[in-house]
Amino acid sequence: MKKTTDQKAAAYRLPETTTPENLEMKLMNNLGTILTFGDHILAAGYFYDPNGRSYYGAVYRFTTEDHTCEGDIKLVSVSDETFIDNGHAMAWAMSKAN
């Protein structure tokens, strides 16, 4: 059964709404990273999986004109698949930020 974005967000402990600054602070202590990409914040996070594919991608969108680290963002998408590293997870996120 395919998980919804809400279910995946809960599994990875991703906030539905936040700021880029808070998201980065949450992810950086666990091998994660974020990248500003136009109106989007792209995230690659780590969540242990014994099969070795422990990275996931996520896409957030700015909800206001404030695109600084304190602007409001909302979760748009979380990858169905997991990846072997954060580069592949970030590539997935870039492909979804349209």
Residue ranges and their predicted role:
Residues K2-I41:
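Negatively charged, low-complexity tracts enriched in Asp/Glu with abundant Ser/Thr
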Residues N29, D39, D66, D85-G87:
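Intrinsically disordered, low-complexity cationic segments
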Residues E70-H88:
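A short, exposed loop/beta-hairpin motif centered on an aromatic-Gly-Thr core
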